[in-house]
Regions:
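RNA-interacting cores
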Residues: 1-175
């Protein structure tokens, strides 16, 4: 299938409010911990950061269903629509669009869980609360992005990316 061609990035770097966040999952954890121990300067080509302090927060209880809905804010736009889903989305009315986006978000979370080696027995519930149902265009690929928040019964690490464009910083969540 379409999703089988992609691997979820195990190391993600986000720059939010002039802070750098490095997220490592599974085999991406140890390299990040090693890196933070000897990090003085980060050079991204167009911007260089001098590193004065690092904090490491490790959690083992992520990527699992929970018995309640957790609220997550989208710190960066969630790129929910690609060319294929975008053309389907455009012909829907607003009520259908909300259901469609809830299903896409659920699929994003299920994909993530499978990538982490988790076989879900429970249903994943999602409820989007977006600032607009009109997607913001993302680059020349005709992708569509949304801002706002969502609720789900799945525990996600802060600053992790969901949706399309993760390697470019899209879809960062905070709950």
């Amino acid at each position: 299938t379409y999703r089988n061609r992609f691997l979820y990035p195990r190391v993600q770097i986000k720059i939010l409010n002039e802070q750098i966040y490095m997220v490592g999952i599974n085999e991406g954890v140890d390299p990040i911990i090693e890196l933070t121990e000897r990090l003085d300067i980060l050079d991204f080509g167009n911007i260089t950061f001098q590193v004065f302090d690092t904090e490491v927060d490790t959690k083992d209880d992520q990527f699992r269903p929970v018995g309640r809905l957790i609220r997550y804010r989208l710190l960066t736009p969630w790129v929910a629509l690609n060319q294929m889903t975008g053309s389907r989305y455009r012909i829907l009315n607003n009520m259908e669009r909300i259901g469609f986006l809830n299903r896409l978000l659920g699929q994003n979370i299920v994909f993530l869980a499978r990538e982490m080696g988790i076989e879900l027995q429970e249903k994943i519930f999602t409820k989007v609360n977006l600032t607009s149902l009109f997607p913001k265009p993302v680059d020349e690929r005709n992708w569509g992005a949304f801002s706002g928040e969502f609720r789900t019964n799945f525990l996600l690490p802060n600053y992790l990316g969901i949706g399309n464009g993760i390697t470019r910083g899209y879809g960062a969540v905070y709950g």
